[in-house]
Swiss-Prot record:
Encoding gene per record: purC
Known catalytic reactions: 5-amino-1-(5-phospho-D-ribosyl)imidazole-4-carboxylate + L-aspartate + ATP = (2S)-2-[5-amino-1-(5-phospho-beta-D-ribosyl)imidazole-4-carboxamido]succinate + ADP + phosphate + 2 H(+)
Family per similarity comment: Belongs to the SAICAR synthetase family.
Keyword ATP-binding: yes
The UniProt record lists the keyword ATP-binding: yes
Enzyme class, spelled out: ligase
UniProt name for this protein: Phosphoribosylaminoimidazole-succinocarboxamide synthase
Pathway stated in the Swiss-Prot or TrEMBL entry: Purine metabolism; IMP biosynthesis via de novo pathway; 5-amino-1-(5-phospho-D-ribosyl)imidazole-4-carboxamide from 5-amino-1-(5-phospho-D-ribosyl)imidazole-4-carboxylate: step 1/2
Recorded superkingdom: Bacteria
UniProt-listed InterPro entries: SAICAR_synt/ADE2_N, SAICAR_synthase_Vibrio-typ, SAICAR_synthetase_CS
Organism name: Vibrio cholerae serotype O1 (strain ATCC 39315 / El Tor Inaba N16961)
Disulfide bonds: none
C-alpha cells in the first residue's frame, strides 16, 4: 500500500446518514446526524445531554493547512501521515486533564476511532481565544515595527524576540467575518480588544456580559493546566488558540464549554525547553512547517500578505512540496503526541474503511 493511500486526505465523502450537507473545514468535516439518530444514540449510549440534543460526527483528516491554504507533496501525497490521529489524541488527553482539574467540559461525547469524535452541537463564541506566554509570531512582527498596543494591551519597551512576556496575555481575534460591529473591520482573524467584546458581547455570541469573565477564566485555567503538563515533559507552551461555545445540559440550562481542539501543534506553538535555554528555538508545532514554506518559496510576501491571496492559493495548488517536508512534520507531530500522551500513536493503514466499519457496526450510522 502506498503512502498516499494511508493518508486520509478527503474526509467529507463518508456514507454517514445526515440531515443536512456535510460541513467541510480546512482539516475537519462535520456530519450533522438526523434527529432520530441523535435521540437513538443519546439513549443507547447514555450520553449526558438533553434527550433532544443535536449530535454530529466530526472526522479529522491528515490535511496540512498553513497560511490559509492546503498543501500537498510529490507522489500524490495530500496530507501528513499520522497527523489527524496525533491531533485528536493530544486534544483527548488535554480534555481528560481539564476534567480531572474540574474545568469546563468539551463538546466531545464519544471517540469511536482515532480520527472520529461524536460531539454535541454547540453555539460558538465568535472569538479566536488566543493566549500568549512569549512574544513571537504576529505580536513580535507588530512590536518590531514599533507598535506598542496589541489587542488593546500596552506592551512595555525593551522586549526581545521570543522572550517570555511579563505576564500571560489574552489577545483575541474575530472568528470568521463579523459585520456591523463598530471599530471592528469586516475581515477574518482581526485583532480585537476586551473593550470591543464588552461593548458588543451579543454580536460575539455571548449570552451575558459576565460570561466574558467566565471565558477568560476558562482560557487562563486551560492554558495553565497544559503549560504545567508540558513543562514536565521538557516543553514550553508558547501560545495557543482556544474556542468556546454554549451547549444545553440535561436540564436544558446553557453552559460554556471548550470546543474544537486544544493544545495541539496545529493550534499552538510548543518549544523544546532545553534548546530554548541554550538560545535555540526548536518548534514542536506547525510553526516549523510555516517557516519551511517561508524559506522554500523565493517571495515569502505572498504567504504573509493577505492582499495576495489569489497568488497564494495558486502557489499551494500548483506546487507539490518535497515529500520530506511532510514527513518531517509527521515526525514532529507523532513525537510531541507521544511525549504528551505517554503512548505511541497507532497509524491506520486504511482509515476510511475502518471508520465506516465502526460507525456501521457499533453506531448504525452508515447509509446503505
Amino acid at each position: 500500500m502506498s503512502l498516499a493511500d494511508q493518508v486520509l486526505a478527503v474526509n467529507d465523502d463518508l456514507p454517514i446518514r445526515t440531515h443536512q450537507p456535510v460541513h467541510s473545514g480546512k482539516v475537519r468535516s462535520v456530519y450533522w446526524l438526523t434527529e432520530q439518530d441523535s435521540r437513538r444514540l443519546i439513549k443507547e449510549k447514555g450520553y449526558p445531554v438533553a434527550e433532544d440534543a443535536p449530535l454530529a460526527i466530526m472526522v479529522i483528516s491528515d490535511r496540512i493547512s498553513a497560511f490559509d491554504c492546503i498543501w500537498h507533496a510529490e507522489g500524490g501525497v495530500h496530507g501528513v501521515p499520522g497527523k489527524g490521529a496525533a491531533l485528536n489524541a493530544i486534544s483527548n488527553h488535554w480534555f481528560k486533564l481539564f476534567k480531572q482539574h474540574g474545568l469546563a467540559e468539551s463538546h466531545i461525547l464519544d471517540i469511536p476511532h482515532p480520527f472520529v469524535w461524536i460531539v454535541q452541537k454547540a453555539r460558538p463564541i465568535k472569538i479566536e481565544a488566543i493566549c500568549r506566554q512569549y512574544i513571537t509570531g504576529s505580536m513580535w512582527r507588530a512590536y518590531a515595527k514599533g507598535e506598542r498596543e496589541f489587542c488593546g494591551i500596552t506592551l512595555p519597551e525593551g522586549l526581545e524576540k521570543d522572550s517570555q512576556l511579563p505576564e500571560l496575555l489574552m489577545t483575541p481575534s474575530t472568528k470568521g467575518i463579523l459585520r456591523g460591529i463598530p471599530g471592528v473591520p469586516e475581515a477574518d482573524d482581526v485583532n480585537i480588544s476586551r473593550q470591543d467584546i464588552e461593548a458588543n458581547y451579543a454580536a460575539f455570541n455571548f449570552n451575558q456580559p459576565q460570561d466574558i469573565d467566565h471565558y477568560e477564566t476558562l482560557l487562563k485555567q486551560g492554558f495553565a493546566v497544559i503549560s504545567e503538563a508540558l513543562k514536565s515533559v521538557g516543553q514550553l507552551f508558547v501560545d495557543t488558540k482556544f474556542e468556546f461555545g454554549y451547549v444545553a445540559d440535561q436540564q436544558g440550562q446553557q453552559k460554556l464549554i471548550y470546543m474544537d481542539e486544544v493544545g495541539t501543534p496545529d493550534s499552538s506553538r510548543i518549544w523544546d525547553a532545553q534548546q530554548y535555554q541554550q538560545g535555540k528555538i526548536v518548534e514542536n508545532s506547525k510553526e516549523g512547517f510555516r517557516q519551511f514554506l517561508l524559506n522554500y518559496f523565493p517571495d515569502p510576501d505572498i504567504l504573509l500578505n493577505k492582499d495576495r491571496m489569489p497568488e497564494r492559493e495558486a502557489l499551494a495548488r500548483d506546487n507539490a512540496l518535497p515529500l520530506e517536508a511532510l514527513m518531517d512534520i509527521s515526525r514532529t507531530y507523532l513525537g510531541i503526541a507521544e511525549k504528551i500522551t505517554g503512548q505511541p500513536i497507532h497509524l491506520s493503514h486504511q482509515p476510511k474503511q475502518e471508520i465506516i466499519a465502526i460507525l456501521d457496526k457499533e453506531y448504525g450510522l452508515i447509509e446503505r
